[in-house]
C-alpha cells in the first residue's frame, strides 16, 4: 500500500533579522517546524536569501531598501537601516502574504524576529496570528524590558547597582547588557534596536525564547510572582544531530553568510589528543578590541595549549610579532569554521568565547567547558551565568580600572577548565547541562511540547 503524505498542519512565514546570529536559530526553528509537517516560508532580504540552502525550506526575498548590500559595511547606520527595512520590508512582506492568500496554503502565522517589531503590525493588518522570536536569553530579555518600560532609568547608573528583577539573579552594572550601560553613549543606535523590541511585544500571540526548561530557573519569590518576561521556551535551536537526532541529516544550520573552512579543521583536530585543544572564537562579527586581541594571543602563547583560533585575516597582521611562528606546531588559525562540528570533536577541551548567546548555547548543549571574554551587548550577562549559575567555566575578569582582560587572567581561566580538580567539577556540570538540553528537544521534552502546542494553535 502506498504511503500517504502527512497532512500539512499549517503555513508559517518566518522573518529573521538578516545577520548570522539571528539567522541560525530562526532557520533552525523553521526546520524543526517542517519536521513536524508545518509548511514554512522564510521571508528575508535579497542579500541574505541565497545564504539559506536548506532544501526543505521555501525562501522568498523581500526588500530592506538596500537589497544587494550587506549589513555592517563601512559607514553603515543602524538607524537608517532600521527605518528602511521597516518601510520597504512592511510593503514587500505584505505583498508576499497576499500572494499566498489565493493558493491552497494561505499563511496562518508570522514569526518575526523581535528586532523587527513592525512584523506584528503586518501580521495584524493581514489578520494573522503572530509570534515574536527573541534571540537573547530570558534574563537579558527581562532586563531590557525593564529599561524599555522605564522601570530602570537610561542609561544605567553604576551607582544604582545591583539591578534586581524579582525571580532572577541580581546584576551588577558590568553584568547588564552593555548597550543600556557602558556602551549606551558610544552606540546609542544599538541600544534603540534592543529597546524597541518591547513596546508592542505583549500584543503578540506568542513570545518565543531560545532557551530550555531549567536553564534560567527563577528563584523563589517571597513577594509575589516572578517579574521575568512571560515567554515560551523552544530551544536550544541547534541542529538535531547534536541533540535528539530525530531530524534526518540535520548537521548544520543551513544558512551561512560566511564560508567555513571545514576539512582543514577536522584533519588538524584528528591529530590531537582528546580534550587537549582550546577552541577560540569570538563570533561572526569577530569583534575584539586591538589591545584585547594582543592579550588573547599572549595568553595562548604562554599557555602551551593546542588551539584552533577563528580569526579574521585582517586581524592576523595585528597579532604580536613572532606569535604565528612560535605557535605554529600547536595552532591552527582559520577565518571561519563550522563551529558545531568543531565543538563536537573529542579533541576539544574548552571553548574560549565572547559568550554570544548562540555560542553559549552551543557550548552548553555539547557539554564543552567555557572561558568567557565578553565584549559587549548581552555577552556580559551570559558570561556571568557560565561561571556563577551553570558552573561550566569561568568569566575572565577585567583588570581593575581597565576595560581589558590581561593575559595572566586568561591563562588562569584556561588552565582552570583544562587541568586539575576544578576542571573535573566543571566537566561534571557541563555534562549535566548537555543532558538537559538533549532532554528538552527530545520527544516529549519541555521544548518539544511547547513547539507542539504552538503547531496545534495554527489556524484556530
Swiss-Prot record:
Alphabetized InterPro entries for the sequence: UDP_glucos_trans (IPR002213), UDP_glycos_trans_CS (IPR035595)
Reaction equations catalysed: (Z)-2-phenyl-1-thioacetohydroximate + UDP-alpha-D-glucose = (Z)-desulfoglucotropeolin + UDP; a (Z)-omega-(methylsulfanyl)alkyl-thiohydroximate + UDP-alpha-D-glucose = an aliphatic (Z)-desulfo-glucosinolate + UDP; (Z)-2-(indol-3-yl)-1-thioacetohydroximate + UDP-alpha-D-glucose = (Z)-indolylmethyl desulfoglucosinolate + UDP
Record keywords: Glycosyltransferase, Transferase
Tissue: Expressed in the vasculature, the apical meristems of roots, shoots and inflorescence, and the junction of organ or branches.
UniProt-listed SUPFAM superfamilies: UDP-Glycosyltransferase/glycogen phosphorylase
One of the protein's GO biological processes: glucosinolate biosynthetic process
The protein's name in its UniProt record: UDP-glycosyltransferase 74B1
Originating organism: Arabidopsis thaliana
Gene behind the chain: UGT74B1
Amino acid at each position: 500500500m502506498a504511503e500517504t503524505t502527512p497532512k500539512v498542519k499549517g503555513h508559517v512565514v518566518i522573518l529573521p533579522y538578516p545577520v548570522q546570529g539571528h539567522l541560525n536559530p530562526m532557520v533552525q526553528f523553521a526546520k524543526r517546524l517542517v519536521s513536524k509537517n508545518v509548511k514554512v516560508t522564510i521571508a528575508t532580504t535579497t542579500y541574505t536569501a541565497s545564504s539559506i540552502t536548506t532544501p526543505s525550506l521555501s525562501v522568498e526575498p523581500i526588500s530592506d531598501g538596500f537589497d544587494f548590500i550587506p549589513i555592517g559595511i563601512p559607514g553603515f547606520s543602524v538607524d537608517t537601516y532600521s527605518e528602511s527595512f521597516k518601510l520597504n520590508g512592511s510593503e514587500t512582506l505584505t505583498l508576499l502574504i497576499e500572494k499566498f492568500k489565493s493558493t491552497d496554503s494561505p499563511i496562518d502565522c508570522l514569526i518575526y524576529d523581535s528586532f523587527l517589531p513592525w512584523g506584528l503590525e503586518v501580521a495584524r493588518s493581514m489578520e494573522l496570528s503572530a509570534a515574536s522570536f527573541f534571540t537573547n536569553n530570558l534574563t537579558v530579555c527581562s532586563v531590557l524590558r525593564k529599561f524599555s518600560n522605564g522601570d530602570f532609568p537610561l542609561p544605567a547608573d553604576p551607582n544604582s547597582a545591583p539591578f534586581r528583577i524579582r525571580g532572577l539573579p541580581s546584576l551588577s552594572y558590568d553584568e547588564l547588557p552593555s548597550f543600556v550601560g557602558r556602551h549606551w553613549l558610544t552606540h546609542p543606535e544599538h541600544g534603540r534596536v534592543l529597546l524597541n523590541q518591547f513596546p508592542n511585544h505583549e500584543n503578540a500571540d506568542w513570545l518565543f525564547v531560545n532557551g530550555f526548561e531549567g536553564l534560567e530557573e527563577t528563584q523563589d519569590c517571597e513577594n509575589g510572582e516572578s517579574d521575568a518576561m512571560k515567554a515560551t521556551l523552544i530551544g536550544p535551536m541547534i541542529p538535531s544531530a547534536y541533540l535528539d537526532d530525530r531530524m534526518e541529516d540535520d548537521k548544520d544550520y543551513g544558512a551561512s553568510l560566511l564560508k567555513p573552512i571545514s576539512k582543514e579543521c577536522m584533519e588538524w583536530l584528528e591529530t590531537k589528543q582528546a580534550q587537549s585543544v582550546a577552541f577560540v572564537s569570538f563570533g561572526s562579527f569577530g569583534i575584539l578590541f586591538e589591545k584585547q586581541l594582543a592579550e588573547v594571543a599572549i595568553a595562548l602563547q604562554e599557555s602551551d595549549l593546542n588551539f584552533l583560533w577563528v580569526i579574521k585575516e585582517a586581524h592576523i597582521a595585528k597579532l604580536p610579532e613572532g606569535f604565528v611562528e612560535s605557535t605554529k606546531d600547536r595552532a591552527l588559525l582559520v577565518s571561519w569554521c563550522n563551529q558545531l562540528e568543531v565543538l563536537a570533536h573529542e579533541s576539544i577541551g574548552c571553548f574560549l568565547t565572547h559568550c554570544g548567546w548562540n555560542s553559549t548555547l552551543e557550548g552548553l548543549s555539547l557539554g564543552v567547558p567555557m572561558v568567557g571574554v565578553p565584549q559587549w551587548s548581552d555577552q556580559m550577562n551570559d558570561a556571568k551565568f557560565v561561571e556563577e549559575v551553570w558552573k561550566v567555566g569561568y568569566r575572565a575578569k577585567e583588570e581593575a580600572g581597565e576595560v581589558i582582560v590581561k593575559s595572566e587572567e586568561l591563562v588562569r581561566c584556561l588552565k582552570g577548565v583544562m587541568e586539575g580538580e576544578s576542571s573535573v567539577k566543571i566537566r561534571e556540570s557541563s555534562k549535566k547541562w548537555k543532558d538537559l538540553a538533549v532532554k528538552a528537544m527530545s520527544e516529549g521534552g519541555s521544548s518539544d511540547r511547547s513547539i507542539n502546542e504552538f503547531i496545534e494553535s495554527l489556524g484556530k
